[in-house]
Amino acid sequence: MTTPEATPEAAPEPAPEPAPRATPGATPGATPGATPGATPGAASGATPRPEPLPVVLAGARGHGRWHLANIRRLQEDGLVRLAGICELTPLTEDEYGGEPPEQSADFGALLESTGARIAVVCTPIHTHTDLALAAAERGVHLLLEKPPAPSYAEFRRMADGVAAAGIACQIGFQSLGSHAVPAIRALVADGAIGRPTGIGGAGAWVRPEDYFRRAPWAGRRRLNGVDVIDGALTNPLAHAVATALALAGSTRAEDVTGIETELLRAHDIESDDTSCVRVTTAQGRPVTVAATLCAERADDPYVLVHGTSGRITFWYKQDRVLVQRAGHGPEELHFGRTDLLENLVDHLVTGAPLLVTPDATGAFMKVVEAIRRAPDPAPLPAAAWRRVPGENRRVVPGVDGLVAAAADTLSLYSELGASWALPAGQAAPGSARQSGEPSAQQSAPHPPKEVSTR
């Protein structure tokens, strides 16, 4: 089986840090940097070090470069060994930074020839399911990039297949490895912000027009009749959706009872670049996430937990938390993060629980499915966006404030008076409700609008 070449991202993430950092305020847990299989506190050499697990990386360009650097970091720590790279066009020595390991465009054959125990799959969205099942058929464990699939049916085919094969599968929502996630859940459970009333998420990013031309599937909802479902909420800012659902305690498919979407675009693409979604959960608390790739200025995305007597803001790329509650001054906390590949190795060696199983992304995949089934994103009026001179990008004036307001008030764009959206109560362009359930706005009161803490 061959794999399509990995897709370059417009702005790849920096290489992983060489060693985990100290984490004041982090929740108790595994010691950062500990070697899976080693006995904590044992004298050097007292416990035999496990053999490094052979890893094959499918997709080593674009965002795959981050995974390549991470695998090499863990290789230096003796946890894994990079056994092979699957690319249609092999990496050169200059790209790899030396002599690369075995390379092949045939993913299945490469898994077999290298004896891989783990496959890291970072390929175009619509190839994920087939590659995951190819690994599962060979008993190879998986770290599968997000989004795990372009539709709920493909997700179920993947999840059921890996479960039947008995392999471990981790979905690559790196933010869910943050120690801030369980810490925030504990604060909410302890009543730190009163009764939780809803979760907001905000992502205001900028992307040049070339971003949507970086690969044949970029900016597409379908390619050659196959679902792709690229888009602001399903791909670049998917972490905001998944993290908001995780903090709401609504991660499984059955936790979702209704979804409203508003999908728009300033670019000449099929997919959305400015969108929002409101999820009604079985708990009755709304989860609203707004995103744009046409911001006036780039900002760090965040998730906001609303309560009757306070709020908690989580900048998930920074592992930074701000707690604001009645009767207390603001408290800022910084947390560590467990790398998801390292957690997968730990699971295989010591039996440690996986952090992001396929079932724990079922609610996210319900959002992807709602976006897939929604009307195609509506083009914004020409007067609603402008080009930035010398920057080759499009901006929607005022969208930064709308994204923040959506997270603050749990509202959709059409309810916030956006000049390019219809008033609340009318069918906004590109909008859809995927359930007959009452809307989240009807089922839970909005907290008063507050100043954004971005």
Question: What annotation goes with each model-predicted range?
Answer:
Residues 113, 118, 124-125, 129-176:
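Beta-strand-loop-alpha-helix segment that lines the small-molecule cofactor/substrate pocket
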Residues 80-82, 350-363:
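Glycine- and charged-residue-rich phosphate/anionic-cofactor binding loop of Rossmann-like
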Residues 6-47:
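Long, intrinsically disordered low-complexity tandem-repeat segments
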Residues 235-320, 327-354, 368-372, 385-436, ...:
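Contiguous beta-strand/loop segments that form the cofactor/metal-binding neighborhood of enzyme cores
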Residues 83, 101, 117:
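Conserved acidic residues
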Residues 176-259, 267:
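Predominantly a Rossmann-like dinucleotide-binding segment in NAD(P)-dependent oxidoreductases
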